[in-house]
Amino acid sequence: MSDTPKIVCKNIWKIFGTYPQRTLENLDHSLSRAEVQAQTGHVIGVKNVSFEIKKGETFVVMGLSGSGKSTLVRCISRLIDPTAGEMIIDGEDIMHYNDAQLTELRRYRMSMVFQHFGLFPHRKVIDNISFGLEIRGVSKKERRSKAMEVLEMVGLHGWADHYPRELSGGMQQRVGLARAMAVDPEILIFDEPFSALDPLIRREMQDELLKIQAEVQKTMIFITHDFLEAIKMGDHIAIMKDGEVVQIGTPEEIVANPIDDYVREFTEDVPRYKVLLSLIHI
């Protein structure tokens, strides 16, 4: 992990509604999110969020349902346009990017892995994995070679010519991970990728991703609602509530010094040995 920031998020706001900019300009900052919605009919998805993500680190965004974590991460890729703020990647504010620049960013530098695998049922595993390379115009021989390489990396040797329906849920998620890795992105974004899996398979996938990250050292953003998963996966964790980041720190910092009762509720039942184990990366 480098000390150089890969992503810098500065004062990001996302307000949903008919007049988001006007609502932000006239906002009474003393009001809660529920009060803002009641008075204006607008919903604050992300509220004045700032942080840095270093090159090669795994940054976890953690919070309960409705906390704003998925909205925030979609702002990072500009799948959702923020209402205000700066989103700086490699020194460039992508808020100023046009459609062509955003397409290039998502096609060449950034990949996403979702909870629902999104595999093409009519395409074999190898063709699902190589899809991003196909979109880029990479030759069939080259994309098959790269797809086979990442297939091996995620532990699916021998499954190249099978269809998704022939795979278990855990195996399908491995294909989703391989598809994201195949395009060799600088940034990988995971939106609760393992939450639909059985607990045992979920732990296996967490371990697999930690193993891969130790090898490839990508910049990873990982969303979860599970605090144990957060402390296992993250170099740093941002905990969200009602659209705000309430605390950022390493797993051990957050467990040792929760900033308020909301964070303390996540940490109080976590045995110390769990934190220590989470820091032993594969």
Residue ranges and their predicted role:
Residues 85-93:
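Conserved ABC transporter NBD signature motif
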Residues 248-249, 257:
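ABC ATPase "signature
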Residues 163-167, 171:
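Conserved ABC ATPase signature
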Residues 77:
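Helix-to-loop junction immediately C-terminal to a conserved catalytic motif
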Residues 280-282:
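Conserved small/polar residues in nucleotide/adenosyl-binding loops
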Residues 182-186:
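A short, proline-enriched helix->beta-strand linker immediately N-terminal to the Walker B motif
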Residues 26-35, 92-93, 130, 134-137, ...:
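Conserved ABC ATPase "signature" region
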